[in-house]
Amino acid sequence: MADTVSYRPKAGEIPTQPGVYRFRDKTRRVLYVGKAKNLRARLSNYFQPLRSLHERTRRMVTTAASVEWTVVGSEFEALQLEYTWIKEYNPPFNVQFRDDKSYPYLAVTLGERIPRVLVTRNRIAKGARYFGPYTKVWAIRDTVDLMLKAFPVRSCSDGVYRRAELTGRPCLLGDIGKCAGPCVGRVTPEEHRRLAEDFVSFMAGDDSKHIRDLTEKMKQAAGTMDYEAAARHRDAIQALEAAMGKSAVVLQDNVDLDAFGIGHDELAAAVQQFIVRGGRIRGVRSWVVDKELDVELGELIETVMQNAYEGADAPPREILVPVLPDDAAELGQWLTGRRHENSGGGVSDPAATRGRLSGRVELKVAQRGDKAALAQTAEMNAKNALILYKTRRSSDFVARSKAFSDIQDALGMEDAPLRMECYDVSHLSRTNIVASMVVFEDGLPRKDQYRRFSIPESADDTESIYQVISRRLAYLRKEPPVEALTPANGHDLATDLDAEAVEAAERRRKKFAYPPNLLIVDGGQPQVAAARRALEESGVSGVHLAGIAKRLEEVWLPGSDFPVILPRNSDALFLIQRIRDEAHRFAITYQRSRRKRDITTVLGEIPGLGPARVKELLKHFGSVAQLRKAAPEEIAEVRGVGLRLAAAVFERLADR
């Protein structure tokens, strides 16, 4: 393999100004679009020696056949052009979004002569105002039903409206007071439009203003003894308050913002958007991003912003994000432009709307208070959405079958890997060394066959892998040695095995008797070499071996100098990544429980410090690490622990 690509431009040919670049393949298809503050500095990163590039970047660069660039006047112009080209070319190596077009919205068609309210999944009506997205259609219908009591806007179809005009008879909603009846002349088109604009204003966050206005009208009607009008205003107030009650109050009344949470791993990211208007959550949007190249969180946020506000949605003045991207100022400028472009939206008084949509858009990271709590909730929802996405994907039988076939072909296996075992090692500064074994059969976890290993001594991870694989493979021999009867659950080796112990160990051996089609270790070439040594010494045959390296997601085979590259977002890589992550989780959980057990034992040996006080100490400080950092005076603040006992705890932890 050549050390660089043949189409690499000379350094002097690439300008140092801001610009946008495109990589194309032999058919001139655009593979990747990127922007740069300094084109020469950015593009030089792609033309380093291939062996030093991230694997996904290397794949893109070697797939491409040419690169071209366009110089612009500023970073902001680069951002705009990048956005335009990504939309135009849909490059496969840029972040790919799984769209959320199926979400229902509440729409008010202000662009029509007689506006109407409707629930829709399409956002194509010109001049319409959209609210949402909502997670359930019934939630919108409940809100609309309450709102029509206060703002009786037309909600019928065009056919029903024309029939009412021709017959002079209103529909049922007009008879029960949930439509003002513009079809039969009960109100003029202008009066009906004002009702629709009030509906929009309330949904946009001006709810308190309308409640105050209706309350004042109710008092005036009662003062003039027009009790029928006062009752109508009272019912309208109750309906609006009920509609407001369906939206969670999270911030002050005058706060408009969008909060974004992102949960991501090497292959995908889930995005959660909370739409807050007037201090209330007015909509929730969730979608999944397929990551092709290894993008940082800041770069991912930039792409998320472009996706979220590419349509008719006007960004609020404040947007909460997990981290600020490097070009936050330019991104804010672009969002401000989108905000001003979407002002006016079909209302009769665009100047008023422009006033509401004026001002710069600013990206922020919430540090404390209610906004930080909202941002944390968005992030938690995003992480849960990512887990749900991965779980649903892994439970898809067709996807699992394709994954087996692809893994079999990529690794040169005779049979599909219907049983896979994965091993991971965990330790804390070479202490409490443990390992995990997880089992997937037919692409699904078999938790009853998971095993945990305790490793007394080990020089490094490769030695630990060798020990664990040796112990596991010993169970596959026809006549296992005494060492193989050691429980693979962290217990110490019993030197004097009586008949009952041998029988129990034999039962455990039978549980280990099923050989894996594919044995995976968490790691690269060194770990795979250690596992291969254990496999060869065991004499066991018919077991294929592979390793998956962290971060790069490369699959290594024994004796190979180059990794096997499974396609990004493929079902095969997803399955291997999932079993690796499960092994890591299982090892970490066991390692933490060992540390907690050890520290509890150490503390329990201190005279006067019983189980209740040990529990109180750990509860007060939250973790062993925080307890170790605490001074004797801080430890003494714990209920039931005096200065003398605190000093003993401090000294004992300092000795370890």
From Swiss-Prot:
Transmembrane segments: none annotated. Residues 16-95 form the GIY-YIG domain. InterPro entries: GIY-YIG_endonuc, GIY-YIG_endonuc_sf, GIY-YIG_UvrC_Cho, RuvA_2-like, UVR_dom, UVR_dom_sf, UvrABC_protein_C, UvrC. Keywords: Cytoplasm, DNA damage, DNA excision, DNA repair, Excision nuclease, SOS response. It is found in: Cytoplasm. It holds the Pfam family UvrC_RNaseH_dom. CDD domains: GIY-YIG_UvrC_Cho. It comes from the Bacteria. GO terms for biological process: nucleotide-excision repair; SOS response. GO terms for molecular function: DNA binding; excinuclease ABC activity. Its main location: cytoplasm. Signal peptide: none annotated. Residues 208-243 form the UVR domain. One of its GO terms (cellular component) is cytoplasm. Belongs to the UvrC family. Interacts with UvrB in an incision complex. The UvrABC repair system catalyzes the recognition and processing of DNA lesions. UvrC both incises the 5' and 3' sides of the lesion. The N-terminal half is responsible for the 3' incision and the C-terminal half is responsible for the 5' incision. This is UvrABC system protein C. It comes from Leifsonia xyli subsp. xyli (strain CTCB07). The gene is uvrC.
